[in-house]
Amino acid sequence: MATYCDDLGPSSAPPGQAQATAHPPGYEPGDLGAVGGGPLLWVNAPALSPKSYASGPGPAPPYAAPSYGAPGPLLGAPGGLAGADLAWLSLSGQQELLRLVRPPYSYSALIAMAIQSAPLRKLTLSQIYQYVAGNFPFYKRSKAGWQNSIRHNLSLNDCFKKVPRDEDDPGKGNYWTLDPNCEKMFDNGNFRRKRKRRAEASAAVRSGARSVGGAEAPALEPPSAACLDLQASPSPSAPEAATCFSGFASAMSALAGGLGTFPGGLAGDFSFGRRPPTVATHAPQTLNPSPGFAPGHQTAAAGFRLSHLLYSREGTEV
């Protein structure tokens, strides 16, 4: 059969099949016999699946299927990918996003919003829970974690005040209200903890100073007129600067004498133009310096509090 086809040549075949009888690239004539049916059978079967070629010896050659170039089943209709995206967006709308995304508010801000939404500006703990879970679906999933945070913020934040129930008001649990001084601190979802007042902080500092010193420290003298003129004038004269510094030195000497924390003789060294003494005159002789440290390091370390405060650099103006 193969010899008959070769003798006839291309004239015996129809014009449409002349080019189709060419062997596919990568195949020898011996391989065509393994198909079963000769070359005419291969020519008359254009839709032959590539499975028969893969069963032959050698690696599978590059084979172009007859349907090459046609839209495959995986591509789908035009715009199929966009349709899938739209379907996904339709399932997750605004309400679905609220359930998945945590609101950008702190727990203190949530409590403040709940209290401000009440007609009487006061709510119980359970009512605050209901407001948070009703307006923010994200908190409906796990209630244990954020409810504990709500309780901690109510007890630790000074801006939330506990109000007891009236006698004619049935129910259990106290009310929580917002301090009027803290209403201005709530802005755009940010709610900061209330800081201590300056008067309370200064009173705490004064009480701590009394407990450390054993007695009330003498108050510093008010600045004299020469000091005020010194601040106003750009280039003060030498006598005015000396008067201002002598007043400051006398106030520091009085403070050192009242507290009794400075070594003897150190308070008298605050005169103008004198440096504090070295550690060699005040340090105990029983202390042994550690190896590798010279006495000069101890002198610099001990005189840091006052010498570096008053004489930070040689030639610095006071």
From Swiss-Prot:
Asked if the Swiss-Prot or TrEMBL record annotates the protein with the keyword Transcription, the reply is yes
Which segments carry the region annotation Disordered?
Answer: 1-30
Write down the Pfam families for this protein, in alphabetical order: Forkhead (PF00250)
Q: Tell me a Gene Ontology molecular-function term this record carries.
A: RNA polymerase II cis-regulatory region sequence-specific DNA binding
Output the superkingdom of the source species: Eukaryota
Which Gene Ontology cellular-component terms appear in the entry? chromatin; nucleus
The UniProt annotation gives the DNA-binding region as: 102-196
> Which InterPro entries does the UniProt record give?
Fork_head_dom, FOX_domain-containing, TF_fork_head_CS_1, TF_fork_head_CS_2, WH-like_DNA-bd_sf, WH_DNA-bd_sf
Q: Which PROSITE patterns match?
A: FORK_HEAD_1, FORK_HEAD_2, FORK_HEAD_3
Please, one GO biological process term?
cell differentiation
Keyword Signal attached: no
Location in the cell: Nucleus
Keywords for this entry? Activator, DNA-binding, Nucleus, Transcription, Transcription regulation
Q: What does this protein do?
A: Possible transcriptional activator.
This chain belongs to the protein called: Forkhead box protein I2
